[in-house]
Amino acid sequence: MDKIVVKGGKKLKGEVNINTAKNSVLPIIAGSILATDGVLINELPMLQDVFTICNVMEQLGYDLKIDKKENKLIVPPLNKDPLIPSEDLVKKMRASFLIMGPMIAKYGEFKLARPGGCNIGSRPIELHLKGLRALGAEDSNCGNGFVCIKAKKLTGSKIYLDFPSVGATENIMMAATMAKGTTVIENAAQEPEITDLINFLNSMGAKIYIEKPGKIIIEGVDSLTSTEYTPIYDRIEAGTFMVAAAITGSEIKINGVNKDHCSAIISKLKEAGTEFFDIHNDENSIIVKGNEEIKPINIKTMPYPGYPTDMQSQMMSLLSIAKGSSIITESVFENRFMNVDELRRMGANIQVEGRTALIEGVDNLTGCEVKATDLRAGAALILAGLVAKGETIVTDIYHIDRGYVEIENKFRALGADISRI
């Protein structure tokens, strides 16, 4: 199994290009099911999670065409009855469940294994099912970990989400695109990836708009047509490289940044002493400059527009060498402190009580062998390795490959001493 080896102490310089957002691409691929004709997705990130959902689509019966040279994906229409994806494949990734809404909308009946993904806490699919029930679908456990859903017809409804779940918002929204009448989702997720999915669906002929933050209205249509679409940039990958500049005290240029999407990340990094410089006539790039002294700060993760839980682990690595005490409160996922033990092995002083981590900054981290416990924790350990004394070996990097395209090559191009073995 591959490992990533980082020898710390190198300053970073140069520029890095950010990929399109994994968390946009996955629901967009699922949403392609709704089209009566083919869909072309540009700037496809070559990630393991993307390959997984493509495999799910292929097991449904779709004849996908991935152009790895041009980073494009063609999803042709399915001109036969869909098949059932294997349980083993679906359990690899939670986002596999995103095909449920589109499949019910288009075919009226479907069976799917309960999904998997990072083990970062309870993420029940009940919110998804509750929303689909409100549209007229019926679900049941059909044995061996499978969920069966069917609907003679879907009818628009007013749906209130108990929590602004991104996945539930996406699934309900896609199912409602071809429901009869109007669907209103209250307390809907507000993440940029939600808006991106709306723009994608509307480009196929859907009628979806955001009336106000947290309220989405869908007017059902008879069918959706083909489209060509380019997803938004990945704000979490951009944030990861921002932290890389901050933790190493380096100056780098990041290309492919929507600064509005990253506003909470940028705000907290500025509070910690990091500087940001806009580039004239280049709104999608930014220069990030870290300083020698990292200031301690407090962070509480929240649904968007709050500070993203997907950037919590990376910030913990940064604050582990801040000059003073910091507090991180994780309010989204209860198991997102699994990287703490690994950072402690490197010399970090972190105490956890429930959903709160108290971080006492130390002068230095020391390289050792650590394990990526999930996608973002793995990236955070690479960040820690960039500034640690000696050599850091990160194992279980298949987690990292789920969400970062050749992360070691991007860091090496910036001057880091990093390799995959």
UniProtKB/Swiss-Prot annotation:
Record-listed E.C. numbers: 2.5.1.7
A biological process term (GO) from this entry: cell wall organization
Pathway(s) the chain acts in: Cell wall biogenesis; peptidoglycan biosynthesis
Family matches, as SUPFAM superfamilies: EPT/RTPC-like
Positions of phosphoenolpyruvate binding: 22-23
Modified-residue entries (2-(S-cysteinyl)pyruvic acid O-phosphothioketal), positions: 118
Family: Belongs to the EPSP synthase family. MurA subfamily.
Protein name per its UniProtKB record: UDP-N-acetylglucosamine 1-carboxyvinyltransferase 1
Organism per entry: Clostridium perfringens (strain 13 / Type A)
Species classification: Bacteria, Bacillati, Bacillota, Clostridia, Eubacteriales
